A protein has these predicted regions:
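Conserved acidic catalytic loop of the alpha/beta-hydrolase fold
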Residues: 201-205, 216-230
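Conserved alpha/beta-hydrolase "acid-adjacent" motif
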Residues: 462-467
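C-terminal motif of bacterial Sec signal peptides marking the signal peptidase cleavage site
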Residues: 29-33
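Catalytic-loop region of hydrolases
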Residues: 2-4, 13-14, 19-22, 34-177, ...
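Alpha/beta-hydrolase fold nucleophile elbow
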Residues: 228-238
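A catalytic-pocket lid/entrance helix-loop region that shapes and gates access to the active site
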Residues: 162-174, 245-306, 354-369, 373-378
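Catalytic histidine neighborhood in serine/cysteine hydrolases
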Residues: 99, 476-490
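Alpha/beta-hydrolase fold active-site neighborhood
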Residues: 304-451, 495, 563, 567-571
């Protein structure tokens, strides 16, 4: 949300989105190639078992093919589930949740149940996530679990909330996102009040029922609806808050919980802002060090100096770019938002470096694409509702309501604590200024009575610093910590075989990694070669022959150009899906 809470480096927590987009494109590439007689197969796309609406015994859901193109291409089925608006009144007003599943592919007698995923946010669509991630999940899990995800209440297709319109979001995001004068601060406060008033007007019913505790209650209804006695769950980033609250409220309903990239279990707002700011500072320093040591990095040998110079230039003279909605201006605040987004995923470090070095060439388009990943802006200028939901959840969870005076004092302390990003994060403690009172704030995290839980923490995680995973492990009272020594946000499905094998073993039979297990960063986890090589590599991983993968990617780049190709990947542009399918069919036929 653009407001006094809006740090130019983002607070929403969404894992490895670019990798998910690539996985989705790879799925389309494989399917398109197979449709033209190619021999390549992807076992995770095997024909589904059972009838189209089949579920586990006791399931109350009616499953049917998804209508979304990407979900349908991934072989997902969709359903809706009614849940109470207020979990404390189960017979009261109901709302609808949108669910999706990918059916298990192994023998019927080997099925364990459903494995539910949440991608984080708050505000992340689980259905969009599953459409991309299903093909990345280890085969051993796909053989034995129905993979299930959902759009949490208020998000995506689940009774979506909406606070302000697209034009107002554009206007607020072009304002000053890190106010440093009284006039700028008052404008930011006015923007926040406009946002809150919009939530009250457009989504009054959900305004008081968007807390994580409410979502945890929905998760238990999903468990019941799919017919499972106990829950198997993987939560990334903010999804760890859902999982930890679930384990605290329903410890006897837990089978296996993986919490990857934990949020803080109990930090006060100011402490949370400082910890996250330090996480981004550490990862920015890692980006700079890796860049300076790599001759392929466009910012080498002085990445820090170039970043500072470009930021200063944009503060004085923003770069204007034309898009379908008109003229957009890339200033220093949106530049920091784009840079912060890039720090989430080492996959895009090379692209970000090239964009910064050529900001007045084609780079601004790529920087906008990175910033738009966080704000939810689509290529046509519309917005999804992720930022609306993110703000509503954050303030529904937070019991405190700051005063402006306390916020000013906190801003000074935050700025002093963060030498590199202090002004960017300074006003984060005022995120819930003037919000309605929280009806159902976060409960105390304590799951000592639950079965063992697996927490995964990444040393170089900017958005959910490693120490939060340590704190979550201690707070749960029943958890084991697995450490990934790399950079980026979260580790499962991106941290290599060491992480994936440990998580898979735990989900299959409850086997925890040994106390103190640390997985080393993959040798190729950081590359400044750009998206082309990364995409080819992932296409090969998913089942395309090397020659075909290179043919598809190079054909797409040749058609639209490298900068536009990277932009389309970063923005999940639907036109790129058609381009990839076209070249997949051509390359499968030897064209």
């Amino acid at each position: 949300m653009p407001s006094v809470a809006s740090a130019a480096v983002p607070t929403p927590r969404r894992p490895f989105r670019t990798r998910l987009v690539v996985a989705a494109l790879a799925t389309l590439a494989v399917l398109a190639g197979c449709s033209e007689g190619a021999t390549t197969t992807v076992s995770r796309q095997s024909p589904e078992r059972g009838t189209p609406d089949a579920g586990a015994a006791g399931s109350e859901l009616s499953w049917a093919g998804c209508t979304d193109d990407m979900a349908a291409a991934a072989g997902l089925e969709c359903a809706t589930l009614e849940v109470p608006l207020d979990p404390a009144q189960p017979e009261g007003e109901q709302i609808e949740l949108a669910l999706a599943r990918k059916r298990f592919t192994g023998p019927d007698d080997q099925r364990i149940g459903s494995l539910v995923f949440n991608p984080g946010g708050p505000g992340g669509s689980g259905i969009e996530f599953l459409a991309s991630a299903a093909v990345m999940v280890p085969q051993e899990l796909g053989d034995r679990f129905d993979m299930v995800s959902f759009d949490p209440r208020g998000v995506g297709d689940s009774s979506p909330v909406r606070c302000i319109d697209d034009a107002t979001k554009d206007e607020q995001l072009t304002g000053d996102l890190s106010p440093d004068t009284e006039e700028e601060l008052q404008r930011a406060i006015e923007d926040q009040q406009e946002f809150i008033d919009g939530c009250r007007t457009n989504s009054p019913e959900l305004l008081e029922h968007m807390s994580t505790a409410d979502v945890a209650a929905d998760l238990d209804r999903i468990r019941e609806a799919v017919g499972d006695e106990t829950l198997s769950y993987v939560g990334f980033s903010y999804g760890t808050s859902i999982g930890s609250v679930y384990a605290s409220l329903f410890p006897d309903k837990v089978r296996a919980l993986v919490l990857d990239g934990s949020v803080s279990p109990d930090a006060a707002p100011e402490e949370e802002v400082i910890a996250q700011g330090r996480g981004f500072e550490r990862t920015l320093q890692s980006f700079i060090e890796h860049c300076n040591a790599d001759p392929e990095c466009a910012l080498a040998p002085d990445a820090a100096g170039t970043i500072d110079r470009v930021r200063a230039e944009l503060a004085q003279d923003p770069v204007e770019v034309e898009d379908p909605t008109g003229t957009r201006a890339m200033g220093s605040d949106l530049f920091d938002l784009a840079l912060g987004t890039a720090l989430y995923d080492t996959t895009v470090w090379g692209t970000a470096a090239r964009a910064i070095s050529d900001v007045r060439g084609g780079g601004a388009e790529l920087l906008f694409a990175l910033a738009d990943q966080q704000t939810g802006r689509q290529p046509d200028g519309s917005y999804d509702n992720s930022s609306d939901a993110q703000s509503m959840v954050a303030c529904a969870d937070q019991e405190e309501r700051p005063t402006l005076e306390a916020g000013r004092a906190a801003a000074e302390r935050i700025a002093a604590a963060l030498p590199e990003l202090g002004q960017t994060f300074a006003w984060g403690a005022l995120a819930c200024l003037d919000w309605p009172e929280a009806a159902n704030p976060l409960p105390r995290i304590d799951a000592a009575d639950a079965p063992p839980i697996l927490v995964v923490g990444t040393l170089g995680d900017p958005a959910t610093p490693y120490e939060w995973s340590e704190e979550m492990t201690a707070a749960l009272g029943s958890a084991r910590l697995l450490t990934y020594e790399g950079d980026g946000h979260t580790a499962f499905l991106r941290g290599g075989p060491c992480v994936d094998d440990a998580v898979t073993a735990y989900l299959l039979d409850g086997t925890l990694p040994a106390e103190g297990t640390r997985c080393p960063a993959q040798e190729d986890s950081v590359s400044f070669a750009g998206l082309r090589d990364e995409i080819v590599s992932q296409f090969v991983d998913i089942g395309l022959p090397q020659q075909v993968a290179e043919c598809v990617v190079d054909g797409a780049i040749g058609e639209v150009g490298e900068v536009e190709f990277d932009r389309m990947v970063l923005t999940r542009d639907e036109e790129l899906q058609a381009i990839v399918q076209q070249h997949s069919m051509r390359c499968a036929l030897g064209g």
